[in-house]
Structures are given as structure tokens and as C-alpha cells.
Amino acid sequence: MGFDPKLEITCIDGKMKAGGLTVRTDDPTQYLRELLSSYRSPRFDYLPSFTGGLVGYFSYDYLKYSEPSVRCGEQDEDSFKDVDLMLFDKVIAFDHVRQKIVLIVNMALSDVEVGYNKAKLELEQLVSLLKTGEKKQEAPGRLLGEVTPLFSKEQFCAMVETAKHHIREGDIFQIVLSNRLSAPFEGSLLDTYRVLRTINPSPYMFYFSGTDVEVAGASPETLVKLKDGVLHTFPLAGTRPRGKTDEEDKALEESLLHDEKELAEHNMLVDLGRNDLGKVSKFGAVQVEKLHSIERYSHVMHIGSTVRGEIRDDRDALDAIEAVLPAGTLSGAPKIRACQLIGELENNKRGIYGGAIGYIDFTGNMDTCIAIRIAYKKNGRVFVRSGAGIVADSVPETEYQECINKAKAVVSALTLAQEEDL
């Protein structure tokens, strides 16, 4: 848990803000790299994996800085930031296994004695706060109206048909189209996060509250992970709903693993993952460690694979994010042309959805997930977005329903959070 951020860094359309400073830039990645260079720390194995660094999100639309040919949609009525990160040098880590809290404060080494005394005082203040601090009661979240889609079933199916035309013409092989649900909303998403932990436990559970946006999510999919020079990405593509019984669940698994359309889509995205990691990996170091395993979640199951690489000496975590974002499972193949068509067909900036949520720490390591299975709130509205992979033989109505299925867990969490005493 990040506590008392030292700095919040945001960027929208090249306008970068950090604290009270505002600059114009065509390369926010380089700005972030220079910022991180001032905060370097060794890795201590006895401490939790994250001991301080940048935490937050890179939006789907962050792609425009590395690929100017991509137009990420004209409509942007909610003005989500391209990047929103907080710099934490104080961390509260809770060990669920040992039921212990670890308090971490980073200290400057320019004057060791002064830095040590300052860090010691901050730790004492943290201990005091945890023991005696007042509990801040967030206003309960509440839906104030009907959850409505951005695209009707007819509109979405028409988008699918247009995408299939581009596939038949050889323009693309696959594309991921999304739909967005939204509703008027008041209060906090913190209870929604708590419900998600119960009904949709996932590898990545997160709650993030920035200056003007709030995000709660349960993402099943890593975007890219960097640990001690080793890169990993885990493509998930191919979906079935969970069965009501073990027998039905197993039958759905067999159906998924023998579905030529789903396997073709998945294999295409594994190749795309290999290509993305290859941009920043040492020559010959990229390999597929695991292929076609079934990953089960509360409402759906997916086909999953694991791709590994070793980062080049002249590349870093920020380069890896640029190389992989957005994931092939949220864009298509070839990626750049698919993203161009997404901008034309959806004509609505995706914002946080399909971007990266996670951290880059002071040691240079990184862990980010794809921003899916999330609820995000801004300007008195809550949003849930989900997508479906379109290939040559896709059935439009089936793809529309896949978007609905993927959104169910998050919509259920929003509803349950206002009904239960949490």
C-alpha cells in the first residue's frame, strides 16, 4: 500500500505535470526516465517485492507517443490522462500469510546521518499513525442510474462486420473491438474493490485513487513483467464461460481447446507477444515457456501461454512498456494497423481500459497488468469496458455477448458493493 505520495505525475496530449511544474513534451517516457534516475535503490531479498517507485497507469492511448500514425479516437468527453503515476518513497506492506506489516521508508544518501534520522522519524510517525490514527470513512459507492452501453448491439455488430471486411481484404488478421458500459455514480469504489477480491479473485487486485480518477480492478493478465533482467508476458485469448458443474466446466474446457477459431486467435497473439518482447530483448533470448494452458476465473476461462525474454543492456522497464503497450490481446495483428482501425471504428478514446496498471520500482524492476476487468470513476460516472477478438469467421452476435460476459464480474461488484454491509 502506497502512503503519502511524494509526487503525482500526469500527462495528457503532451502536457506533463509533476507537482507544481508543467512542461510540454513529445516524449513523456524520457521525462519519466530522467525522474526515476534520481531514485535508485538496491534490491533487498528480505523485503517485499515493491519497496518504492512509480505506481499508477499508462493508458491505451499512450501508444500515440511511440506510434504517431495511430489516432486513438476523436471522442474524449471524459479527458482521461494518458499517464497518471504517483511516486511513493513510503510503503506499507501487509504479509497475508504471516499476518505482519512491514513499513518501508527510502532514505537519501547525500548525507547519510541526516537521511537516516529523517527515515527513522518517518517510520516512527507511520507506527504512531497505524496505532492511533483515525479511520477515514469513504462515502459508500452507489449507482444512480441504469448501466448503459456506448454501442448498441446493432452498432457493435456493424463494427464487427466492418472489421471482418478488413480481414478479408488482408488489411489485418485479427482485431479486438470493445464496448463501454457507464452509469451515473457517487461515492468511492473502495467497496467495489473489496467485493472484487471476494467474487473475482485474480492475479492482479488493485485500487488506485488519483487526483480526479478512481480505479478498482481484478485483472487476470500480465502486460509485461521485468525482474532482475528477465521479461515475461502472458497472453490470454480464447474464452468460455464457467460451467455450473465440474462436468460442464470440463466440457467447456475441451470445447475451448478444440475451437479452431479460438486457437488461431491465441496463436496469433502469442506470436505478437514474442515480437513485442523481441524489440527489447537480447538476440535469441525470446522463447515460449508454456503454450495453451487453461486459466480459470470466477466467470470465465481463457487459454493462456507464457513468453519469456532477457532485456538488453541498453533498455529498461519504460522501454519494455512502450514495446508491449497495448497488448495484442487488446489490439490485434498486425498491431499498428489494428490500432489504427480501432481508432476509426470505435472513435472513442479508450483511456485507462487496455492500458497498463502497476509499478516501476527504484531497483528497475517492474510489474504491470493489462487494465481489464476494471471499474473506473470520473466526473460523477463509473465505467466498465470489455472487448472481443474478431477474426475472419467471427459471429457478430457472439462477440457482442463475449463483451457482456467479460463485464459481468465488475458490474456485479458495483451492484453488490451498494447492497452489502462491508
Region roles according to the model:
Residues M1-L422:
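Extended alpha-helical targeting/anchoring segments
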